[in-house]
Amino acid sequence: MKLIGITGMPGSGKSAITKLAEKYKIVVVSMGDVVRYETLKQGMPLNPENVGNTAVKLREIYGKEAIAVPCLNYVNEKYNNEDFVIIEGIRSIYEVNYIKKHAELDIIAIHSSPKTRFERLSGRNREDDSNDWNTFVERDERELNFSIGRVISLADYMVVNEGNYMDFVNDLENTFKKIINVN
Amino acid sequence: MKLIGITGMPGSGKSAITKLAEKYKIVVVSMGDVVRYETLKQGMPLNPENVGNTAVKLREIYGKEAIAVPCLNYVNEKYNNEDFVIIEGIRSIYEVNYIKKHAELDIIAIHSSPKTRFERLSGRNREDDSNDWNTFVERDERELNFSIGRVISLADYMVVNEGNYMDFVNDLENTFKKIINVN
């Protein structure tokens, strides 16, 4: 089995992978799925509090490599027969390194400029709404503090999502096809 | 004046900017130029020891924002009449933030996968020469510790250098022309 990790800053367009996954019938696992699965495994009902507590507990148990450890378990338990599994929401280089040590993993990073991402996320074309801009920068900062900058810089594939959306989806699909060996 | 900063992991192909700079007659300033200039300003002859000591001293004086502070001074003193100046070798987000606060700066990041960069730098096609691979990873690590991952992830433009070299140079030139408003 080969894992395909999708990463990118907020608003870069990572969700485009969902449509491609459907088209090529490839399972998508999000880090959130893993936490919910772990919550259920502990016999707790799924509600925001339990899921939140499980996330904290996983980080206590596995340190910087959480949620990679339960993620790999989850994939192996549930999707052992799949040739490819997409993992959404990878943002820590520790998680990447852990998974790469135990499985085959290719990382696709999606890049858009901060200006473009801000416009997408805020639905506006003006950077002078400083409150929104600060919120945007803080959100970026949180992701970067998880070491997503390292994941992006060391990505196996980089797809730029800056101009025409269909061009981007096309580039992403071509990258995707390279990984899953479809011509 | 607008500054154009070039960043990218080792072996990504940053030096391609030199030819473009010549073609469009745009000055290129490297962080090394700045340190040499500061060395001379202090009346010291240019030798590796003096240049090294100056770099250390600049970091002591300006902290994380070195070498951005003397770099901006250098550009303003020497190239005040230029419309555009390229700055090579930006690798710290603190330097980027400092320069953006005081001048107009667009960052172009160049991305190649670790595998491709390793092959370029080692001139080999095998990752199993573990000694070389470790050296490569350590060099990456040093750059990432300077926060180059943040500079890359927050770049205004991303150019991928993965396949055909002329395609890459072409993409880089198109990006470059967008910034300097040439059609």
From Swiss-Prot, chains A, B:
Pfam families: AAA_17. The keyword Mitochondrion does not apply. GO terms for molecular function: ATP binding. Gene3D superfamilies: P-loop containing nucleotide triphosphate hydrolases. Keywords: ATP-binding, Nucleotide-binding. InterPro entries: NTP_hydrolase-rel, P-loop_NTPase. It comes from the Archaea. ATP binds at residues 8-15. Belongs to the UPF0200 family. PANTHER family: DEPHOSPHO-COA KINASE, UPF0200 PROTEIN MJ1399. This is UPF0200 protein MMP1282. It comes from Methanococcus maripaludis (strain DSM 14266 / JCM 13030 / NBRC 101832 / S2 / LL).
